[in-house]
Amino acid sequence: MDVTIDATQTDQKEPILSYSGHGADDAPLNPYKNLITRVALYVMRVNDIKSFPTGVRIHVRNDIPFGRGLGSSGAAVIAGLLLGNELGELNISRDRLLDYALMIERHPDNVAAALIGGFIGSYLLELTGEAAATTQVPLSEVLPEYPENASESWGYDPPVPPQGIGHYIRFGWAKEIKVIVIVPHFEVLTAEARRVLPDMYSKKDLVFNLQRLAVLTTSLARSPPDVNLIFQAMQDRVHQPYRKHLIPGLPRILASVTPTTHPGLLGICLSGAGPTILALATDNLQHIA
């Protein structure tokens, strides 16, 4: 994201937005409709800055396809937080910015990774009382829609994020491991991907996943990577079995693409809710893709 401010352009009251890359034709250029600039305005208004500085021009280069399980909305939220922090010269810490992000995204998985970078584990603190109530404020009050006839003070008093909503840790990552993403030309709605998940799981399936998660987070930091350990630790019973019918060919891919058939492969899985498929590998990247 490139941002320039020309304070001499006193007749330009609102930011001028432009886009390139994925979604460029569909991204709203109205700063009161665009997610990135709405988030930036939220940050500034929480800190008593009523409006954008004059003469702001923003160009967004987006390399993340929308609706593919790659966390595009989380990345946009973080871009907006960083933009608001810079425009308002607020010097908000990284950990505090995560609190702001969680008022919008409501779960830390994507926003923590986008903000911190690297291989991240995260969780939400269980809040009580007023702090818990604040995090449940409808998103429409955090990022209000701006009608055409909205006054300048519309949405000026947004909720202030409680302190310490989200917590994270950065895991180690072996230098040999590379990430491959295979991005289909169709979308899977996150709401639909969540809807197909069951409300209850068997204890056996949860234990299966938790055991492997504990092994996986450590094994990905070991150098050289243990192929068999990582491949087995990436097996899943919690979400892929229920979402596989949303992605044509996924069951066949998961069953047939292995370290034996594709040397260099460490493991393969859905990226987020899909439909993107993510593979970890050390070699033969083009062949695996």
What do these predicted regions represent?
Residues 6, 114-116, 120-126, 162, ...:
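Short beta-strand-to-turn element immediately C-terminal to the catalytic PLP-Schiff-base lysine
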Residues 1-68, 82, 86-92, 127-128, ...:
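ATP-binding N-lobe of GHMP and related small-molecule kinases
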Residues 220-289:
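Glycine-rich, charge-dense phosphate/pyrophosphate-binding loop(s)
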Residues 70-94, 114-125:
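DPxDG-like acidic metal-binding loop motif
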Residues 99-106, 123, 127-172, 199-201:
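Active-site glycine-rich loop that binds ribose-phosphate moieties when present
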Residues 49-52, 70, 104-105, 112-114, ...:
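Solvent-exposed alpha-helices and their adjacent loops that cap or buttress functional pockets
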Residues 180-245:
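Active-site rim beta-loop-alpha module in soluble metabolic enzymes
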Residues 54-60, 92-103, 232-233:
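Beta-strand segments within the central parallel beta-sheet cores of soluble alpha/beta enzyme folds
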